[in-house]
């Protein structure tokens, strides 16, 4: 939901989560970020599904204050030994994403992906992959550049456009014109703006 940078993600504290509202959604206060050097803070949307997952995580970890995303000590077999009170280190975020992809593959959630392709995908994942992916998902859903920048706190449109350049064409002027023409396709009717 939030498209947080890794430095923002590891700083999320229980007190920063507001909600849920009557729809089950919430919002996250982001006190400081790369694009907010003055520390004025910003907010991000939290969906009902995210709010539910956060509620479960906080309950399971018995977290009432402090960092939401804490270090977890595990036994050799991978079972949880202890949920610590220390925040995750920013460098661990990318490794967690890689582990999630491997687990999804093991559970058959990535289709017929072979081991070679899996390793190529895992190697390409970084802590920034979520931000790139959220931009691409929004372009694929034909969200506007301005809406994407506002929702995920980007200041430079060139950055967002670079992440979604291949997908942005689907919502561009040419694509919109083609849709209008297809809707008006009857004989020699000229394509024109339809509101």
What function would you assign to each model-found segment?
Residues 2, 13-16, 32-34, 73, ...:
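Short, flexible loop/turn elements at secondary-structure junctions
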Residues 3, 9, 30, 69, ...:
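Mobile genetic element proteins and their domesticated derivatives, centered on retroelements
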Residues 6, 26, 130, 138-141, ...:
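Nucleic-acid-interacting cores, centered on viral/eukaryotic replication and modification enzymes
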Residues 20-105:
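Basic, alpha-helical nucleic-acid-contacting "clamp/cap" segments
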Residues 63-64, 94-150:
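Short, basic (Lys/Arg/His-rich) helix/loop patches that form interaction surfaces
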Residues 152-177:
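Catalytic-site neighborhood detector that most strongly recognizes the C-terminal catalytic loop/helix
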Residues 177-195:
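C-terminal secondary-structure termini that scaffold catalytic or DNA-interacting sites
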């Amino acid at each position: 939901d939030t498209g947080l940078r890794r430095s923002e993600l590891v700083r999320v504290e229980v007190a920063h989560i507001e909600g849920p509202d009557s729809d089950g959604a919430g919002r996250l206060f982001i006190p400081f970020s790369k694009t907010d050097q003055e520390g004025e803070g910003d907010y991000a949307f939290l969906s009902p599904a995210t709010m539910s997952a956060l509620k479960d995580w906080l309950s399971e970890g018995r977290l009432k204050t402090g960092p939401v995303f804490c270090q977890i000590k595990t036994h050799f077999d991978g079972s949880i030994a202890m949920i610590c009170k220390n925040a995750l280190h920013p460098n661990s975020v990318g490794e967690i994403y890689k582990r999630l992809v491997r687990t999804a593959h093991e559970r058959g959630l990535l289709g017929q992906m072979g081991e070679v392709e899996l390793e190529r995908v895992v190697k390409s994942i970084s802590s920034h992959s979520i931000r790139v992916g959220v931009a691409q998902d929004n372009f694929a859903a034909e969200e506007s550049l301005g809406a994407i920048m506002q929702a995920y706190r980007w200041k430079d449109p060139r950055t967002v456009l670079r992440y979604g350049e291949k997908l942005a064409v689907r919502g561009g002027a040419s694509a919109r014109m083609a849709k209008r023409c297809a809707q008006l396709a009857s004989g020699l009717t000229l394509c024109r703006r339809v509101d």
